[in-house]
A protein has these predicted regions:
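Non-catalytic, surface beta->alpha helical segment in thiol-disulfide oxidoreductase systems
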Residues: 86-124
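Hydrophobic beta-strand anchors of alpha/beta hydrolase catalytic cores
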Residues: 32-34, 61, 84
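Boundary of Sec targeting at the N-terminus
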Residues: 15-17
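Solvent-exposed loop/turn segments at secondary-structure junctions
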Residues: 39-42, 67-69, 91-93
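Short, internal strand/loop/helix patches
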Residues: 60-68
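Structural micro-motif
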Residues: 76-88
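Sec-dependent N-terminal signal peptides
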Residues: 3-13
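Local sequence-structure signature of Cys/Sec-based thiol-disulfide redox active-site neighborhoods
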Residues: 20-57
Length: 124
């Protein structure tokens, strides 16, 4: 029984949903790349875009369903999905929005470059 409780608590932490209430706590602290998706998006998210980004300069990647965080999605002015937003210590630094066809015109090198730029700003 104890093992089952430990397993259930681990699973609930590992697969928690990001929503309007917990969004700020999830992006606060270091580099966070948020991938916003929607049930109705034109194109599925190409995970190769973020390949190699997780862990780069201690970056975290979180996936957010726009339907689960409508206030955050509206505040960030995201209308096409998938879209991505780079945060550093809770502050928005860069936004990549999909075009009308749901295409994101970036790759992991663009994201890594943006992370480097953000961290270079923090030095001065």
């Amino acid at each position: 029984m104890r093992k089952l409780l430990v397993l259930l608590s681990f699973l609930s932490v590992g697969f928690s949903q990001i929503n309007d209430k917990n969004f700020k706590s999830e992006i606060n602290g270091g580099v966070t790349v948020c991938v916003f998706t929607s049930e109705w998006q034109e194109q599925p998210f190409d995970k190769d875009i973020v390949k190699g980004v997780k862990g780069y300069q201690d970056a975290e990647i979180i996936y957010i369903k726009s339907e689960e965080a409508p206030k955050v999605t509206k505040k960030l002015r995201l209308r096409n999905f998938p879209s991505m937003v780079l945060f550093y210590d809770g502050s928005k630094k860069e936004t990549w929005k999909a075009d009308m066809d749901g295409e994101l015109d970036i790759d992991n090198k663009d994201i890594k470059s943006a992370i480097d730029d953000v961290l270079a700003e923090d030095v001065f």
